[in-house]
């Protein structure tokens, strides 16, 4: 593991299961995916696997929450992906402020690019790790692609997402609405590709595991359960403890059982952990992280999804699972008939949702695609016109 603030090589390549003919073709273009969390890896993995199978050389630069035991040491999941190189970088210590994490990540990724120069750097979303990689790629004149730009939310992270859009040379967005927002930021329509949300590719395919296997692996004792996730809102960190106490208090009062996926490491997380640690174990099963296929199977069979994760407003509607979005974290992110809304302190609304929606199933909502993002991503990268696009961008005025 590299020391904080300086990159040192720590790579592994596993090509045992990649077909020989694809490996011979893979000397053409090199792609580097940057991942800092379990969430963005769930979106990048199907894209990376499809690119590997199409003959591209694929590598991951792994940092952030992936490197921390408290959050499940999810770098292990990246290492499980065959046929790719994996490079690790420790970019933070517990309690580091976001600006320090950003600075350390810039230093580490800059050192990495001095030794490796991929043909394309791919980042996702709005995390500081993605922002650092986008900035370093831009200042080193390395082509970069931003996945799921043009989204809106209720947190300061939305600013980071829009920064990534301006730094990237190519954009792979989840919807026509997102494309319109990216164009409103002056980006060329020819560099924006609507592919849908990549994680739906996984949810649209068989998970490969049964619910019984998932429950056994993660020691989940109930077959009637909801999934609860409550992340910090960085601009509301002073109130996160009170919000978490009210939210989980309402869940506890319902008499239902819940699988609780632990929060990310944004500022305010410690107060949420303190609330979760006090929940009764006979009603709440706390899990730091899950393999994506196992989580997909768990969610398909859940009675409801509650909390402030994007899972509730994007993936749950696609699977037809009722969801309750709590607070401001996903404000204006998405709407669907199966998604309901409440403030963390609105116990009566939370109770009403659990009473009326628990166990219901809704028609699939395809506002973020049909589960074919990886195919569309590869099709764009196979077009030589993609690689001929100049790195120098021009601001495109609307109308």
Please state what every model-predicted region is.
Residues 123-124, 131-134, 171, 291-335:
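A donor-sugar binding/catalytic signature common to diverse glycosyltransferases
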Residues 30-35, 40-54, 89-189:
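Active-site and donor-binding regions of nucleotide-sugar-utilizing enzymes
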Residues 34, 67-70, 168-242:
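A nucleotide-sugar donor-handling region in carbohydrate enzymes
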Residues 67, 74-79, 209-301:
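Donor-nucleotide binding loops and adjacent catalytic segments primarily
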